[in-house]
């Protein structure tokens, strides 16, 4: 953002919501924003080049995360990713008959809360646990909400509005103890 010489440059503190790209990421992405923009699902030469680059990126991300490339799904952003994770896990569990319970907090990103609202209308059990006055998940309330039918627990690592950092190690321990089959989404 350009600023007149006599004005202070603003300091943007909401890095939990968006963060400037690292120079290496800009360099790796720029060719696909400025020229090599083929549809990776197509069959022509430009599309095949885009698909090769996409699959190469998938392998790099998979290696960094210690998973297989087939486990890496790229989305357009956080909202789409939250919807996919929460709804996908819930519907997969229901189709496998492993449970129908979803646990989240009242302090989650709206993409998670709206996904939970939709799933609740579709017959899933949704528990929305409280947070402390400091914005930290109430671990006792979380523990009470977990049971053997819980299939996904969603607790955001860092709140994008006030910056509280959740105790995910403690959350994960509770999930392992009380709902061992549940996925932890953050």
Model regions: which residues?
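Pyridoxal 5′-phosphate
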Residues: 1-186
